[in-house]
Amino acid sequence: MIVTTKKGFKKRLKDFSKQQILALIILGAIDVFVIAAPYYVKNVVPNLHLYLGITEDEVATVTSIIGYVTLATQLPGGFLTNRFSSRKLLFLSAITTGAITFWLAANILTKNQQSHDALFIQYCVIWGLWGITSTLIFWTPLWKLASQQATKENQALGFGIQGAANGIWGLIFIFLIALIITSIFYPSGGSENADSKPFAAYAFIIAIMLVITGFTVLFFVKEKPIEKQSQTTLVSFKRNLNQILVTLKNWKLWLLSFFLMGMYVFQSTFAYYLLQMLQNAFLAPVVLVTVIGGIRTYALRSAVSVYLCRLADKCKSYILFLMICTVLGIVFVLAFILLGFVQTNSANITLITFSSILYIFTGILSWGMVTVRYNQIGEIDIGKNNYASSVGLLSFIGFSTDGWLYTVTAEVGKKYTVAGQSNTSNTGYQIIAAICLSIALFGLICGSIVFISNSMEIKRLNKASYRWRDLDNA
């Protein structure tokens, strides 16, 4: 299913203006900093709970809170994006997320002077507010703006440039600082032994960068004009409601949403729990785990995003490309789970090496999924002016695991936590990974159904490509 493109990479890159490339780089930056503290830091910093002064299952609990808020705000976010300037929504998101991150930093700085319950309650509120600022006014506007920087033929390449920029920003500002903190200030004796100042400074840096990137989006990223009226009328309300109803009636869009959910576990729960398993079950050195986490989360995204997106653009179907990535990812994670049956009471170099390689390979596939997942929309009929609503539904279903799945993993983790420890056991990690693997398999089945249906459709219509429709992303 791979076809040769008419243009080489350099010629296709020239299709982008300097303004568009700059915009994609800026969008990569704001993507890093808005998502970093709520989601990605725990995938880079092993045993994040020690720095926060809480337990591992409580980290899963606060993550589930942001997931539930995401569920409540994802679809309204699509409505807002259809109605208001995406650029201004991103600016508002960056400023408010930055303010909340300042609050987080202050709590980390004073955690030894606060009770455990007081800290945990504040973290619950912080993660809940992040759910609003990183979803309602951020997620759909981000991808709508990124999509507008490229033609329909270069959609994947455009997302690849944004993803590569994301990786570079994250590598410098998230990973390298985290590496310094974990290699020098890791609280090996428990959270009470941690020096709170370095990690608090880390949070302050993220907050400051959020404010800076917010203003760069406002002044340097262009967007297509949207149809507006001077005031909200009954007619415009009915039109927007109709767009949402059309989206909700699209069965293929629902199945692709479940497919995205299956892919998302590789980016979220696998990225977190397999890293924790490396640290706490396989007893890998904390610096090694931080390096692997940073490479997977940021360096790989920068290194492979453009290449994988070029490969996806050459493929007749983005859905097929994502199916291949998912199948390989399932195989690698299954192998990781099986390695957990190797009994060890001390660090096993062979075990750590193989599991680290599997973790990296899974990360490569994950970023292939991330950068192409919204390109699926171009292979189904979504109707006119429904792009943002379609992204909203995909994200609503796809990222719902941040809510209900982390609630499940928190309970499993708590049940299998050995008395006197703050993290779960090897068996707990295996059970959590197996649950996530079943979700990935379900998503793969859903994606396969849409691909088969599309194959029958293009055969009936005598089309040469799965991407024969015009992409309406205004």
From Swiss-Prot:
Q: Which GO terms describe its molecular function?
A: transmembrane transporter activity
One Pfam family cited in the UniProt record for this chain: MFS_1
Q: Which SUPFAM superfamilies match?
A: MFS general substrate transporter
- Coiled coil residues, start to end: none
Q: Which family, according to UniProt?
A: To E.coli YihN.
> What is the protein name stated in its UniProt record?
Uncharacterized protein MG294
